[in-house]
Amino acid sequence: METDFYTQTDKISDGSSGNLTEQNINQSIPEENEVAELSKKGYALIKENKIDEAKNAFKTILEKDENNNYALVGLGDAERKQNRFNDAADYYSRCLASHPGNNYALFGLADCYKAMNQYHKAIDIWEQYLIHDDKNITVLTHVADAYRKIRDFKKSKQLYLRVLDMEAENAYALIGLGHLHYDFKEYRDALYYWAKMLEVNEAAVDIRVLTSIGNCHRKLKTFDKGVYYFERALQMDERNFYALFGLADCYRGMNQQFRSIEYWNKILELDPKNKVILTRTGDAYRNMGDYVTAADYYNRALNIEYDLYAVLGLALISKGEGRYEEAIISLSRLIQTDRKNHRLYIDLADCYIKTNRKAEAVDILQDFQKLGLRSSAVTEMLEKISA
């Protein structure tokens, strides 16, 4: 088929061209060349991170052709590079209004919606893209990721598996499936996909794969296996928060409090005002019977800001030292601020039992049940008291 240009010149030769003349066509050729050069320059400037200069180049094109698809997509890309996603989305939308189905505009617009956490809109756009290219692995994994973000397990998994049918060892699909199953608390399945990722890339493994495998073992309470992967991660980065946290928590789970303290304190060397870690360290010292040091860590956490678990830790120290009335007052206050925490009711009931107030212990446990909540620990304690 002839190009538009040759079709137009044929019309000129037979006198059917209307206002077109050979002269104005000759004038349009340099203009087209100028637009092409400006477009090429704009994209090169984006690659060099000279965003403002790139925008100027694309805007010059729009002065000549307000609907030029290269310029509109280029401006969208430039705005997106500066994290101005609303402005970028406007340019991509303008392009699509004049050039429906432009793949670059579709991809850019979907990426903007994803960045703005508007996952449903991103999915709609990507599915339009897939009409034109339903085997694009990058887009398929993006759509699967978006479905995962809106917690549509079935559609997300279907798309990840579709990618694996096309490319059995695709890293994005394997990692995505790992995250998907982990998010839905299916830790064994998550472990399978992350282990597969490790197997595929053993020589150059990403540290996040190691910590993810370790986290699955933490959740499955196979703490000794988790230790191995967190230690491997630390060999890659001795300051990695997730590896240090994972090791501390695994040793806590194995009841090796002295080892967990070692890693909690390593985190505190890097982040001394982390109140969650201060409280965890306090818990470890308390479980070892070192109430003085434990209280110091809890108070350090509370000096940063209020923390329920630090207050609970101090209440449990009072209980551990036989100061039951103090513990009862603290635990009763905590229940007022966190009525659904079954642990508070159990500790308070235990204080009542220790002070020979069995009826009050039963009452407080029944108060929890009246909330319509279920806890096997509360039920078992109530049955034991009532027996």
Language-model segment annotations:
Residues 64, 98, 132-133, 166, ...:
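Structural marker of alpha-solenoid helical repeat scaffolds
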